[in-house]
Curated annotation (Swiss-Prot):
<feature type="binding site">
    <location>
        <position position="311"/>
    </location>
    <ligand>
        <name>Mg(2+) 1</name>
    </ligand>
</feature>
<keyword id="KW-0456">Lyase</keyword>
<feature type="binding site">
    <location>
        <position position="307"/>
    </location>
    <ligand>
        <name>Mg(2+) 2</name>
    </ligand>
</feature>
<dbReference type="InterPro" id="IPR008949">
    <property type="entry name" value="Isoprenoid_synthase_dom_sf"/>
</dbReference>
<dbReference type="InterPro" id="IPR044814">
    <property type="entry name" value="Terpene_cyclase_plant_C1"/>
</dbReference>
<keyword id="KW-0479">Metal-binding</keyword>
<comment type="similarity">
    <text>Belongs to the terpene synthase family.</text>
</comment>
<dbReference type="InterPro" id="IPR034741">
    <property type="entry name" value="Terpene_cyclase-like_1_C"/>
</dbReference>
<comment type="function">
    <text>Probable sesquiterpene synthase.</text>
</comment>
<dbReference type="GO" id="GO:0000287">
    <property type="term" value="F:magnesium ion binding"/>
</dbReference>
<protein>
    <recommendedName>
        <fullName>Probable terpene synthase 8</fullName>
        <ecNumber>4.2.3.-</ecNumber>
    </recommendedName>
</protein>
<feature type="short sequence motif" description="DDXXD motif">
    <location>
        <begin position="307"/>
        <end position="311"/>
    </location>
</feature>
<dbReference type="InterPro" id="IPR036965">
    <property type="entry name" value="Terpene_synth_N_sf"/>
</dbReference>
<dbReference type="GO" id="GO:0120251">
    <property type="term" value="P:hydrocarbon biosynthetic process"/>
</dbReference>
<keyword id="KW-0460">Magnesium</keyword>
<feature type="binding site">
    <location>
        <position position="311"/>
    </location>
    <ligand>
        <name>Mg(2+) 2</name>
    </ligand>
</feature>
<dbReference type="InterPro" id="IPR005630">
    <property type="entry name" value="Terpene_synthase_metal-bd"/>
</dbReference>
Amino acid sequence: MAAEAKNDEQQDIARRLAKFPSTIWGCSFASFSLKDSEIESYTQQVEELKGKVKDMLMQSTKEITQNIEVINLLCRLGVSYHFESEIEQQLNLIFASLPSFLNDNGHLDLYTVALLFRVLRQHGRKVPCDVFNKYKDDNGEFKKDITSDVKGLLSLYEASVVSVHGEEILDEALVFTKQHLETLAAQVSPHFEQHIRNALLCPVHYGMERLQARLYISFYEEDESRNEILLKFAKLDFNRLQLLYREELAIVSRWWKDLDLTERLSYARDRIVEVYVWALGCVGSQPQFASSRLLVAKFTQTAMTVDDTYDAYGTIGELRLFTAAFERCSIDAIHELPEYMQYLYKAILKLFEETENDANEGSSYKTSYAKEMFKELTRADLQEGEWFNSLYVPAFDEYLHNASITTTGELLTAAFLLGLKEASMKEIVWVRDAPKIVRNAKLFARLLDDVATHEEEQKRGDCPSSVECYMNEYGVPKEKAYEEIKKILATSWKDINEDYMKQHRVSRTVVNYFINFARMSNFVYKVRDAYTYSTHLKTYVATLFLQPLPV
């Protein structure tokens, strides 16, 4: 059987070549070297201002509206991680006193009420949506006088997307505010107009944290009421973290370059820069998560290469061999594979060897978990290959069951936990139990990916996606399938919100990973498949890694 695969490779086999665009970055990030003096300078300046910003935060606790405003500023500017314990304590106090506070302050404006609602919900505290009832008239419509309150409308719009099932007032608010903001945007100052348009394109709750922070710093800089100390602190910290990210990007770029898979497996996508953006968005921006970011980036690029092998190059016979070899997960199985697959197989085993060598004592079970998730991935990828080979169109739910694995969601979670020192078997068991936020983050990613990529995949020849499966099962045109999948996506996001606001037996860091997974899926696939057509991410890459802020 192995001999057949090798002989086939020497023949002119008809392969499903995708002809993916080449990397737009090459090895440009691999040569970066972090200068200790530069990072030390930024760190010193950040530490000098940190105490003053903390004083500002603590002083704001005298009044709830001022307190929530400062907390929101710290979050939007991307510096709240410096004060996590203080912010958590303050939010607990605000949440506990909120009913009486709102009852005693019926005059509160829409902006403030919506801000309290959003910030508390985004930090896992479920404020009831009836706080917005007072902004409706006797006919159940939103009052006309709020249509001229641009700041309040924007605040309500941002709050409306943190909704759960059964909250009709928030569903109505989303439509109402979006309609009015699209008209009002042209009537405000240019810098506020851009802020509104950014929000309409991507509400903060849906966005990539670091990119949202960069956009907000530019907006805040034009705010006449800005605090210069806070602005400078945010800029310095952004530049400091940017240097750290560039160093991490250089590390994974050199790792990928040394594997030399781009030359040996020219059919596959070289997207090491883009997958690091993914890792940064999913894992989080804090410096202490560097190991997880590096591992998620490495596993994402490796999984992408495996995916391209199954979807866009390998014959069904070769794919069966590769899947069988991976069940053994041993170098002894390498000789059963065609030559090109040997390079990939060896690279994966080497990655696992690295993680085992770097693992803390007594945590080898994390690497075992990652290996098992990789085996699951190859089985699921092969299943799609078998479907394609036999011209079988699975039922919609049958497809989604298998596709929940091919999203690579749990494999990348394993990589995240590998790098998270405090993670233990408790976190792995929680993920394997598949709580609602885990299931729906993967579902959200799969469906967005399919809608963005299915037409081009079908042209070159690929397994039916959720779109084709839905069309086939229900006998509907593509447009109707899109419409129904869009409804599923909306439901999925509400499920994510709902579960996010529940108490879980794992840390908030782990729960955050899954809401970030959904956010990054939205970031990559909302307009087009930005992994494949990476020019769509070029501006964002430059903003995040190449353009420091003037201080």
